[in-house]
Amino acid sequence: MKIIAIRIGDRYGPEYEKYLEEKLPQHEFIWIRKPIREDVLLQWNKMYGMSLDIEEPIVVMDIDVLLINNYDDLFNYPIKRGQFISIPGWWRDTENKRYKINGGFFKYYPKDCKYIYDKFM
């Protein structure tokens, strides 16, 4: 499975990449180190995965995730075509309780989400 992670700028050093690659050697990393377009703000670069023309699910994750215990279960969590999986948000920065996803970890089939990329990018 491919994992996409963003490391743009100097807030996080290459040791963060090394940490994730050592924890997840069975996966292929795609590192986004510069904006996919000049007009794209940092967090929106995560949408790059939705533009990929591949038939397998991918994970898009934050670079500053600490992997502990049996984290393979998270990456191996089953997903069906048409599903979009995220871990729950642990903070409440809004009063709307319907907003539950965490932007730090997504799993989806890129081709199923291409329409989102096309609409917003």
Language model features: what each stretch is:
Residues 58:
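Short aromatic/hydrophobic "clamp" motif used to bind/position activated sugar donors
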Residues 67-101:
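Conserved donor-nucleotide/metal-binding helix-loop-beta segment in metal-dependent transferases, i.e.
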